[in-house]
Amino acid sequence: MDNRYPIGQFNCPSEVQEKDIQMWIKEITTLPSRLHALTVSLDELELTKTYRENSWNVRQLIHHISDSHLNGYMRMKLALTEDNPVVKTYEESEWAKLIDYELPIRVSLQLLESLHERWTYLLKNLTATQLQRTYQYPDGSIMRIEQSIALYAWHGNHHLAHIQQALIRTK
């Protein structure tokens, strides 16, 4: 197993079924509680553990998930209100060096809980037409909202697995 991708790399589905969307929305919905359950009792030393050499630590992973999912939510809202908008990318590794990544993880866990409540309410109420709306990355690649739902469900599970790996590595 490649510990960079403990659940495998993301494979963007070309065709999406309604049952897939419902499963991904459920994963997005439950991510904050799954993260909270896994990390609520961690001490400072455990928060500094990494899942592999030179990787982000548990604290950085939690703050990153919050940042990334905030961006994902905004990308979807842009796609719903504009015609195939070009979305901005960001330097994730540089964001992880900013001072707010030193905050207690409860700050990002609270943000994720509120964000995911709004996000999943939106997702559960999208029409079939809205699920087909798109946004575009600066490189020209296009993502449908239904594919983006798959991406962020995978993303949350991907980093949850990283945190699990880091905590196993600490024992």
Swiss-Prot record:
Domain of life assignment: Bacteria
InterPro entries named in the record: DinB-like (IPR024775), DinB/YfiT-like (IPR034660), Put_metal_dep_hydrolase_YfiT (IPR023774)
Enzyme class: hydrolase
Gene Ontology terms for molecular function: hydrolase activity; zinc ion binding
Keyword Transport: no
Family of the protein in this entry: Belongs to the metal hydrolase YfiT family.
Subunit structure: Homodimer.
UniProt name for this protein: Putative metal-dependent hydrolase BH0277
